[in-house]
Amino acid sequence: MSAPAPSTSTSAATRIVIAGAGPAAQALVAQLDRARFAGTITMLSNRDDTPEKLLELAMLPQVSVRFGQPASHIDAAKRTVATADGMEFTYDQLVIATGSAPVANPVDGAAQCLSYATIDDAPRIADGVQAVARELGRRPVGILVGTGAAAGQAEAVLRAKGVRPIRTTARPAAVIPAVVSAGSSSPFAASAVVFEDGSSMTGDLVVLAEERVARDGLAASAGLRTAAGGGIEISRDFRTSVPGIWAIGDAAAFDGVRLGLLVAAASAAGACATQLLSAASAAPAAPVLQAAA
């Protein structure tokens, strides 16, 4: 999806607050900057570390990143957001991008294998398959662990790359990568997974596609509607049930489905940025998301 058209007609007094600082939030700020948004943007981050991308955004003159100050309370009537340490921020438009969290506890060694949580993970899965295939000189044997829509999408990506994965819903306890040869181009080759029942499976690569739940507690406590299966309910233009509040990324749900499984973060950010610019200038913009048939 293309970036929103540059706009210099937005009010310089418009204040956008973003609850969250993950990939979706970062993409949104980048899109607003690209469109020359003239107001102010405040990002409330639960991170104490300073990843490079976030630091780059913090250098923008209209952007303030509050590291280690996650949003803890929304007063929709007053249009304010408070943090756990008592800071309060007034907004004209609030975007909730608090992401999602795994349902189960982390799996030991998960960093040594591939994972699938959103559409944005598809390119990394494809690249991992290609790297392992080059290393082995053949199609790799893949093990896919997980259930639900994320596992279904991960399987589709693997099959598109010529891998017929062995799929299991058993709960993994640990991922154990085999020792790779010197000069290996892939950290994912010849992996194994051990399950909680003591059984194990060995393959050339392991993909974890475990269930995740939207971090929608902040929104729910402010009276926003949430989906039965989790996630902040949004309309086709990313608006929530409360005026002036929007949601993107894995915290949101459209038509009952976690947004990260429907649209890439960058695409959602670009579309939401267009809507925010439209709201700031009081000019209507066309909706983007389409309900499932």
Language-model regions, residue ranges each:
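FAD-binding core/adjacent interface of flavoenzyme oxidoreductases
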Residues: 2-6, 13, 34, 43, ...
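Beta1-alpha1 glycine-rich phosphate/pyrophosphate-binding loop at the start
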Residues: 2-65, 138, 142, 149-174
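Intrinsically disordered, low-complexity terminal tails and inter-domain linkers enriched
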Residues: 3-12, 123, 130-140, 173-189, ...
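A Rossmann-like FAD-binding core segment of flavoenzymes
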Residues: 65-74, 78-83, 89, 152, ...
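FAD-site-proximal beta/loop scaffold in flavoenzymes
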Residues: 111-133, 200-264
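A conserved FAD-binding loop/helix module that cradles the flavin
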Residues: 248-293
